[in-house]
Amino acid sequence: MPRVYIGRLSYNVREKDIQRFFSGYGRLLEIDLKNGYGFVEFEDSRDADDAVYELNSKELCGERVIVEHARGPRRDRDGYSYGSRSGGGGYSSRRTSGRDKYGPPVRTEYRLIVENLSSRCSWQDLKDFMRQAGEVTYADAHKERTNEGVIEFRSYSDMKRALDKLDGTEINGRNIRLIEDKPRTSHRRSYSGSRSRSRSRRRSRSRSRRSSRSRSRSISKSRSRSRSRSKGRSRSRSKGRKSRSKSKSKPKSDRGSHSHSRSRSKDKYGKSRSRSRSRSPKENGKGDIKSKSRSRSQSRSHSPLPAPPSKARSMSPPPKRASRSRSRSRSRSRSSSRD
């Protein structure tokens, strides 16, 4: 059956006033009055079309009312129905308690926050009022805070229509304010368990992202540290190799041909032997120079040329032999002078 919505009704309006207002537009099957609005059901759809066309923006009890076709489904609740039980064909009141009989409410993402809501307005009144914009799936009033409610629609177009059309309208003497509750922006209130679950999921995701970021940062730091350590080690090794090559190159110039031939031979004790050899030729060189100069001045035949020694111990005897030759030559010279 065609239903017609009546908006901006006076709070003093009665069923008789509605009946007089729609008189001459066919037979009325049901009148459902709410706080500030109502619904009227016609027997014929053509009568409903004529009433919407003729009576929209007309005055009823001092108020300009809105008359248009109802968009939501018909509800057998909280209304005044026209029935045959009264016998005389009058209006009999029939009220039912609780939520509608269409099952549990369906939660959607197309949610509006209703602010400045009258304390006399229940969630049933809010849901019935919002049905003029589209199909309402969920409604709640004064649950988290007083004077605030929640309304959810089946589609985004219905929510947008309610936001554009019903924002600032009056319910029970108060002009309501509608605010779109976007799922991306975290609102300061949570009206359902699903929303709190989505928040916990977002928090867990953000924590996992932070932990993965910190892990990647620590891994990158450890990698950079290991790289810097490897670089320092390679540099120290290269410096040590350079210093070793320099130390090896210096004894070559002092040793001469013997040190060249000995340094080329590689064995396990090459380092210690090369050091002793590098020290011995220097001492040997000094002893050779002194012995050669002194033996040439005193006696050329008594100064034997020392062979290149293999160890540092063999370097001590040559200076002693030179001193013995000196003493012998001195004693001979003294005896000759005495004679």
UniProtKB/Swiss-Prot annotation:
Residue ranges constituting the RRM domain according to the UniProt record: 2-72, 110-183
Keyword RNA-binding: yes
Pfam families per the UniProt record, alphabetical: RRM_1 (PF00076)
Biased composition (Basic residues): 185-250, 321-339
Coiled-coil blocks: none
One GO term (biological process): mRNA splice site recognition
Keyword set, alphabetical order: Acetylation, Isopeptide bond, mRNA processing, mRNA splicing, Nucleus, Phosphoprotein, Repeat, Repressor, RNA-binding, Ubl conjugation
GO cellular component: cytoplasm; nuclear speck; nucleus
Transmembrane segments: none
GO-annotated molecular function: mRNA binding; pre-mRNA binding; RNA binding
Protein modification: Extensively phosphorylated on serine residues in the RS domain. Phosphorylated by DYRK1A, probably in the RS domain. Phosphorylation by DYRK1A modulates alternative splice site selection and inhibits the expression of MAPT/Tau exon 10.
Entry function: Plays a role in constitutive splicing and modulates the selection of alternative splice sites. Plays a role in the alternative splicing of MAPT/Tau exon 10. Binds to alternative exons of TNC pre-mRNA and promotes the expression of alternatively spliced TNC. Plays a role in wound healing and in the regulation of keratinocyte differentiation and proliferation via its role in alternative splicing.
The name this protein goes by in its record: Serine/arginine-rich splicing factor 6
Gene transcribed to yield this protein: Srsf6
